[in-house]
């Protein structure tokens, strides 16, 4: 009996751990089916295994009750949407109410009295259970703004608290799982301050979808990117800024879901020759063939646009843009999606939100890179990686720019960046526009240099930026992006073998199962998962002492060298150096900086996390970490130049905006493309 209880306890612990996995929240719009030709998308076209949560946008409201937008939604789209759960039992579906075009007046009326809110809540539970939704998403843009009175900020909180109470009560009475409750919120600071009590929302909601896009658009007089990952000093708007702002105000990181758009914002340039970031613009570019909205292109339309356009990469913001004549579009692609996904993982946010699933290349017919080329990247990094037995990739795309943490042990770099501390957002976010100086939370190297683990520099062909503390890239290397295209930030190519392969310097690291490494001129082949054995299964004999790493353990018995099965053995009183600490034969400790240590017997190569003194009659466990590792908290330089998927390419290494539109015009929507319905 006690064994059964122990087993149940272990299962519960594992389930709790699974619950900490990243969410991938994807919106699907009820007008996607009305687009012409191959752009028409229905729920059965969606992949039920791609996202962890699917949200149907939008429901409407009538007489303080939630209702389907039209009869077709209720009779066809709702059933087809929720039928996806028959193929994936883990999938959760939610119904969203609101949107930009919904306005605020009906929300205000419903929120105004307890009786109205009670009526709304009863209708919500009834509609969700009738159509087999798992929860409700509130898309109120925005309490206290756009005609909504200031007290809506507080009545909105009352509604959320009352919804949660009713959901819990209904779950107890029906013995069904509690309905989920989420909300879509602005990422613009002045809207956040006006519309939300961040701590209260963070405490009550199951997750919070931060709309960290529509940060720039054709309502402005200068070009700017729709959803840059990081900020520039003259323009703090960015996805990282928005996420760190919510966290700084008290929202739990694990509940914050970063919004990532599958569309771009377009501009019409004043002059075709002035086509960079912050170039003068005179309005929106032409509407897309399928979305038919000025200043806006879905990703599947952007694929056609960029074939004949000049493509550029915005350094420090990690997003692309393209221009063709006087038309300019700032958009996201598979590379920028991967950067954003790794940022989410590095900063321990709850996951990613996609607006929208139906604006990706759903069938793979427009872009030629397979179905859902953008969202698949997020799934690969945020969802499948959580349950994979493979080790994490050898690169962490996590610049300290816009980061909320500072690494005090970061390697010193002689040339750094200078910024005005007054523009730093919550969490120590910083940006850069020129080439030399110093910033607290950022390690930057000038052109032609990169930082190595031994604090030496090596030549690099292009401008480099040192990434965060978990970056494990050296030199100008190439990565393969999540099973898709091979991206080449430097001038060397990476081809995935199994999972990843990397080139550092002149040596090749080829993935065999999990990892294999070539330090010096030796080839190490993994045995099991992370242990390493030198070439031809021969032991390493530095200084006359033989060590044969076979698995995770070493053992010394009396005065003899023994090599038992699945164990490695070293002679007595042998000092094994480590990444951080070595124990000398006299029992003293001393730090290591990459060099070998000499004991009474000989000199040994670096192994694992701890240097151990092997004495007679002692049995000691070595770390199960990979034998060859870089020191922790070591930031390495990363070459930011990418070779794009399509055609020609240039990189914006240094941007000096002419103007800094720090806030949107009041008459222009902050998220005007949140829905494209009439």
Curated annotation (Swiss-Prot):
Pfam families, per the entry: Glyco_hydro_18
Residues in GH18 domain copies: 22-385
Residue spans of biased composition, Polar residues class: 528-544, 651-662
Superkingdom in the source lineage: Eukaryota
Residues carrying covalently attached carbohydrate according to the record: 402, 441, 580, 596, 648
Biological function: Binds to oocyte zona pellucida in vivo. May play a role in the fertilization process and/or early embryonic development.
Name used for this protein in its record: Oviduct-specific glycoprotein
Native species: Homo sapiens
